[in-house]
Regions:
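Catalytic cores of large soluble enzymes that bind and process phosphate-bearing ligands
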Residues: 3-4, 23-26, 61-68, 90, ...
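Non-catalytic terminal accessory/regulatory regions of metabolic enzymes
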Residues: 29, 38, 68, 76-82, ...
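Glycine-rich phosphate-binding loop of ATP-grasp-fold ATP-dependent ligases
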Residues: 20-22, 45-74, 109, 132-133
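ATP-grasp fold ATP-binding core
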Residues: 5-8, 12, 39-54, 83-104, ...
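Hydrophobic alpha-helical hairpins/lids featuring a short glycine-rich hinge
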Residues: 83-148
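Structural signal for hydrophobic packing residues in well-ordered secondary-structure cores
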Residues: 16, 35-39, 73-84, 117-118
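A conserved helix-loop-beta module that forms one wall/lid of the active-site cleft
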Residues: 1-37, 41-42
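Gly-rich Lys/Arg/Thr-decorated short loops/hinges at beta-loop-alpha junctions or inter-strand turns
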Residues: 11-15, 54-55, 142-145
Length: 148
């Protein structure tokens, strides 16, 4: 089962894990309404596809005002997002997640994924955040805790 970032954050909120305020959007119009609802000076506009590397591929942008938010929403929604995990064919962005800006004290990476070599699920946690988790895995694997 694959879930999007916004779905994972909904699960976190149900279990009282602090997460930034965010709103999923399935159309450009919904995304613009979400921006207005967040009432935050800074908003992250995030493509929701089942692949990592969204930021490096241009699918995550920070908007510092309404004009920037509108530009990013219109550019990202419907784009064919190509990342190191999608391959050359990429994936069409059909949903966005808008998240209000916050001051980050600490950031963690968590994932439940399939370990194909062991043919079982693995729960992974790291204090190194998730922006370049593949780099962390290859250069400092001891910073990722795995539980099978």
């Amino acid at each position: 089962m694959k879930i999007h970032e916004y779905q994972g954050k909904e699960i976190f909120k149900k279990h009282n894990i602090a997460t930034p305020n965010g709103i999923p959007a399935f159309t450009v119009e919904e995304a613009l309404e979400a921006y207005n609802s967040l009432k935050s000076d800074i908003v992250a506009v995030k493509a929701q596809i089942h692949a990592g590397g969204r930021g490096k591929g241009g699918g995550v942008k920070i908007a510092k005002n309404k004009d920037e938010a509108e530009k990013h929403i219109k550019n990202i929604f419907g784009m064919n997002l190509i990342t190191h995990q999608t391959g050359e064919e990429g994936k069409k962005v059909e949903r966005l997640y808008l998240e209000g800006g916050i001051d980050i004290k600490s950031e963690f990476y968590t994932a439940i994924t399939l370990d194909r070599s062991k043919e079982m699920d693995v729960f992974m946690v790291s204090t190194e955040g998730g922006v370049e988790i593949e780099k962390v895995a290859s250069e400092t694997p001891e910073k990722i805790i795995k539980i099978w």
